[in-house]
Amino acid sequence: MAPNLRKSHPLLKLINNSLIDLPTPSNISAWWNFGSLLGICLLTQILTGLLLATHYTADTTLAFSSVAHTCRNVQYGWLIRNLHANGASFFFICIYLHIGRGFYYGSYLNKETWNTGIILLLALMATAFVGYVLPWGQMSFWGATVITNLFSAIPYIGQTLVEWAWGGFSVDNPTLTRFFALHFLLPFMIAGLAFIHLTFLHESGSNNPLGIPSNCDKIPFHPYFSLKDILGFIVMFLPLTTLALFSPNLLGDPENFTPANPLVTPPHIKPEWYFLFAYAILRSIPNKLGGVLALAASVLVLFLTPLLHKSKQRAMTFRPFSQFLFWTLVANLFILTWVGSQPVEHPFIIIGQLASLTYFTILLLLFPIIGALENKMLNY
């Protein structure tokens, strides 16, 4: 019998083993769609970003007007820009849901996959931050100033580090140029990391909603899950295009329609919505270094989740107390996001501090305690 090219060709067999003949648990739900959605988000962002880069000028005097030119004079430039800007929001929606899924179903016990995933999240956050600076509007400039300035809280080397990152004594032309270079480079780094992420995942195979080994019941990825993924793509592209066509500036800051001016500070400097939870945690500590450490901890705490898993069961599917805690954490993150968008005034300050405290308490203290308690209740 003639050899099947799909299974023998050095490159095709790589694709075959990842996307066609991959043994997949038969019961994975729609929560397992977000990995492929993140992949399609990345592809969309790279494609639209490349088209935008062909019309963009990384210079403080021209950046703002080059973006305006793209929207006004380039064929479908407005659409490409709107898809790129809102695509970032969908990227973050997908990654947060993907992390939430991993957390709920105990996928973090695949430690290598989980850790590379967190590195991917950090790379995505860095990419989104440097990308937000490129249009050189007011919020771009002041956001860059505020966030890069946080590094000056690092003892001894802080100020030197910030001036080295800026390429001068303030956010200026060298900063914009290097941010453009980084914004171009990082997505390709993300693509490489995603490949590593998948390699680790395929070592152990996917987890499933029951959190039990599924070797006894695996089905081929194609056609079952390839079709399911295509449905996922349609379900995601529908709201994305709707947003980009009908309300493209819904999630943006109106302040960014004003060209950057170092002499005028906007009344409320705040990041895009997907960073607000971390921004709220940063602001909740009335000390610069403490705030920076809390900000870093808000994401880096995810590295500890595999070590804090005390339950004998992997998923939360049959653990009502952990479920309650999980959804409390989700509600808490919504509160943090809301507080991050509010000015630093009386009720919001204390709400932010309580929500930040609750966030770390749930993750570091309550989850392991409740996990151990549930073991006791089940006589494990």
From Swiss-Prot:
Component of the ubiquinol-cytochrome c reductase complex (complex III or cytochrome b-c1 complex) that is part of the mitochondrial respiratory chain. The b-c1 complex mediates electron transfer from ubiquinol to cytochrome c. Contributes to the generation of a proton gradient across the mitochondrial membrane that is then used for ATP synthesis. The gene is MT-CYB. It is found in: Mitochondrion inner membrane. Pfam families: Cytochrom_B_C, Cytochrome_B. It is a multi-pass membrane protein. The chain crosses the membrane at residues 34-54, 78-99, 114-134, 179-199, 227-247, 289-309, 321-341, 348-368. Its cofactor is heme b. Belongs to the cytochrome b family. Gene3D superfamilies: Cytochrome Bc1 Complex, Chain C. The keyword Magnesium does not apply. Heme b b562 binds at H84, H183. GO terms for biological process: mitochondrial electron transport, ubiquinol to cytochrome c. A ubiquinone binds at H202. Heme b b566 binds at H98, H197. It comes from Alle alle. This is Cytochrome b. GO terms for cellular component: mitochondrial inner membrane; respiratory chain complex III. Heme 1 (or BL or b562) is low-potential and absorbs at about 562 nm, and heme 2 (or BH or b566) is high-potential and absorbs at about 566 nm. GO terms for molecular function: metal ion binding; ubiquinol-cytochrome-c reductase activity. Keywords: Electron transport, Heme, Iron, Membrane, Metal-binding, Mitochondrion, Mitochondrion inner membrane, Respiratory chain, Transmembrane, Transmembrane helix, Transport, Ubiquinone. The cytochrome bc1 complex contains 11 subunits: 3 respiratory subunits (MT-CYB, CYC1 and UQCRFS1), 2 core proteins (UQCRC1 and UQCRC2) and 6 low-molecular weight proteins (UQCRH/QCR6, UQCRB/QCR7, UQCRQ/QCR8, UQCR10/QCR9, UQCR11/QCR10 and a cleavage product of UQCRFS1). This cytochrome bc1 complex then forms a dimer. InterPro entries: Cyt_b/b6_C (IPR005798), Cyt_b/b6_C_sf (IPR036150), Cyt_b/b6_N (IPR005797), Cytb/b6-like_sf (IPR027387), Cytochrome_b (IPR030689), Cytochrome_b_C_euk/bac (IPR048260), Cytochrome_b_N_euk/bac (IPR048259), Di-haem_cyt_TM (IPR016174). Disulfide bonds: none annotated. Binds 2 heme b groups non-covalently.
